[in-house]
Amino acid sequence: MIPEILKLSIIGYDRVIYQGEAEFVVLPTQWGEMGVLPGHTKTFALLKPGKIRVKNKGSEEIFTVKEGVIKVKPDEVEVLSA
């Protein structure tokens, strides 16, 4: 069963940048931008400096991040940024 929403955590070196839900997330990776919807295949990726776009309930939030790592599961995205 495909989940309807993603749990998203963006963790910086010394603080939680964002923790909540998302319908769609766009992440800057070593391969270019990666879009993640609920039900996405499990994957790890390297985070490149850039902007993470989080879409939820008709609004969009943008977070500027440095390098780090991304872990994606069908119902969850975890971002660790330097």
Each model region followed by its residue ranges:
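Compact, glycine-rich, soluble single-domain proteins
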Residues: L6-A82
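Short, charged, intrinsically disordered terminal tails
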Residues: M1-I5
